[in-house]
């Protein structure tokens, strides 16, 4: 590989990185505005797992913080669950290089999950509940007003189909929600971002990605099947995923079958005598 070729490739990567940064920043900014995710004076706790999504989220939020018309704080928090082989030095070194305020919470949830869940059974439910409780408590203790998670548009659509196929519910991931205990507001700034854009951005930014060794349970295998289905649709039917995501934002309860969302009992036909009906102009109907 010649020096000229290397230089040309580096230039292409720089241009692509700049394009992706602008795209992701625009989509994150749009999501923040649409759902009022971050307000003036907020203290945002950015949950960092070591994966591409949370790295990209932190990177974009720090970038937006410099240019936003409002003032808000960003802190990074990682939960070290004591998984075997977890490289404990990676995140502290990276976050120190950024100069961002960060915390590493050490809790051995790995042993708890392994002790409570039989071999071969899904660990995701218990693991996520333990992780959620620890992070929620930390946010309250440190007076964080928002908890930012790195779920993106693909995660939202996968969750929708996961719940439809296996749970019989039309339920996805909301871009913003109040925790069950009412103490925290959770936001997903990457809600409008495509995973393939985040993945390419993370590669160009050379984030020190940490793989998760605990997962691989049944729920994640089901999610992987749905991910492959959506990826196949994206290749064969361009624009389908975009339309499906728009559908999640454009729900008509009167055209579904949930009596909790729409009061079908109160539907009444228009009461009118035949003579009166004939007098109405068709153009006015």
From Swiss-Prot:
Question: What cofactor requirement does the entry state?
Answer: Mg(2+); [4Fe-4S] cluster
Report any one BP term from Gene Ontology: tRNA thio-modification
Question: What cellular component GO annotations does this protein have?
Answer: cytoplasm
Q: Where in the cell is it found?
A: Cytoplasm
According to the record, cofactor stoichiometry and binding are noted as: Binds 1 [4Fe-4S] cluster per subunit. The cluster is chelated by three Cys residues, the fourth Fe has a free coordination site that may bind a sulfur atom transferred from the persulfide of IscS.
Membrane-spanning intervals of the chain: none
At which positions is [4Fe-4S] cluster bound? 124, 127, 215
Asked if the Swiss-Prot or TrEMBL record annotates the protein with the keyword Iron, the reply is: yes
SUBUNIT field: Homodimer.
The identity of this protein, by name, is: tRNA-cytidine(32) 2-sulfurtransferase
The species this protein belongs to is Hahella chejuensis (strain KCTC 2396)
